[in-house]
Amino acid sequence: NKPVQYITGETYFYNDKFLTPPGVFIPRPETELLVDCAVEFLSKSKDNLRIIDFCTGSGCILLSIAKKFPNHEYIGIDKSEIAIKTAKKNRKLLGLKNVQFFNQDIFKYNQSKGDLLMCNPPYLSNHEIENLEQSVKENDPLSALTDFKNGTSFYKHLISNFNKLVKKNGIMLLEIPFS
């Protein structure tokens, strides 16, 4: 029942290969829409913007954008050490220099604001976790899937702290569940 991405240690996202060892969330194809939205915003923007990606995981979202728009500053934040180590390896594989990754809890983040803040947070409720496919529960890191509550704590934090996290005229892009 192990996903092929954990067997091979890699997956494709937005036309690039990314390392995805066990313990790091496997990016889903629908998350590429978040990249598309960021690309649309950045294609109409000036250079030298700061793009921040909370819950960065393997770094695939941030790195996919940085590859298309190299004239910006990119910061990826994740509380998982293995995710940050993997994101740094993925950065090296793609040959990108303008991307930094930090091991930090987003609830304690108080550094610089972003012109673009992105996040694909853990959004499943405890009830939804109970009903997930067994292979997902056994293989994906649960902390990347759920806040171990009702699935809204990350959204509440990001929205209530918008002015502390996002610069004036900046935007926030969030992946939200279908439900």
Locations of regions flagged by a protein language model:
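Residue-level signal for inorganic ion chemistry
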Residues: 1, 31, 61, 87, ...
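Conserved AdoMet
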Residues: 1-41
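Active-site beta-alpha loop architecture of Rossmann-like, nucleotide-cofactor-dependent enzymes
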Residues: 5, 124-127, 179
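Short loop/edge segments at beta-strand edges and connector loops
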Residues: 8, 102-104, 176
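Conserved SAM/SAH cofactor-binding pocket of Class I
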Residues: 33-131
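Class I S-adenosylmethionine-dependent transferase superfamily signal
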Residues: 38, 65, 136, 158-162
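Mobile active-site "lid"/loop adjacent to the S-adenosyl-L-methionine
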Residues: 123-154
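Conserved Class I SAM-dependent methyltransferase catalytic core
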Residues: 149-179
